[in-house]
Design a protein with these regions (language model features):
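Short beta-strand or tight-loop elements
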Residues: 62-65, 103-107
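Short, solvent-exposed loop/turn segments that connect beta-strands within catalytic domains
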Residues: 74-78, 94-98, 115-119
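Short beta-strand edge/turn micro-motifs at domain boundaries
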Residues: 81, 104-135
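Flexible, surface-exposed loop regions and adjacent strand-edge segments
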Residues: 138-140
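A solvent-exposed, acidic/Ser-Thr-rich amphipathic alpha-helical stretch
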Residues: 24-88
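Short beta-strand segments enriched in hydrophobic/aromatic residues
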Residues: 19, 31, 86-88, 124-127
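Short, cysteine-centered beta-strand-loop-beta hairpins and adjacent loop/turn segments enriched
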Residues: 89-100, 130-131
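Short, low-complexity N-terminal intrinsically disordered segments enriched in polar/charged residues
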Residues: 1-33
Length: 140
């Protein structure tokens, strides 16, 4: 049987893959209906906010590591917290194909176990270092 920690780490990889493949429907499925993240509230608003930044940018790669997972948050077996390092590279597209933007940071996620498995209920990303041109990120 797969541990809850491993299931959460697998979901984190699913989020990164959805971001990089621009799988908007798949990304939405990884959040609860009322989730907060990326400065938005609600699953649909979160996906729309991400689309505003990644929809028109070229290839991206979200590399994740140094996972720290705290299960049974506040004694609740259906709540968890994860802290995950990320190194993210974005390349430009179209008339911005010569641009790039890279950042290092840490995701802080709160998780809820649902009938469909673990889902993100809250997501924050703290950027500790960045370089390049943020204009690389643009709507599609």
């Amino acid at each position: 049987m797969t541990s809850d920690r491993d299931l959460i780490i697998e979901r984190l990889a699913d989020v990164a893959a959805a971001l990089d493949s621009r799988d908007w429907a798949g990304l939405g499925e990884l959040f609860t209906e009322s989730a907060t993240g990326y400065g938005a509230t609600g699953r649909e608003a979160i996906v729309e906010r991400v689309r505003e930044h990644l929809g028109g940018c070229g290839p991206s790669q979200h590399l994740l590591g140094n996972h720290r997972v705290q299960l049974a948050l506040h004694g609740d077996e259906d709540r968890a917290r994860s802290l995950t390092y990320a190194r993210v590279l974005h390349l430009g597209a179209g008339d911005r194909s010569d641009l790039s933007y890279e950042c290092f940071g840490e995701y802080s996620d709160l998780w809820t176990r649902t009938p469909d498995g673990w889902r993100i209920d809250s997501r924050r990303f703290h950027i500790s270092f960045d370089r390049g041109d943020f204009r690389t990120l643009q709507p599609g």
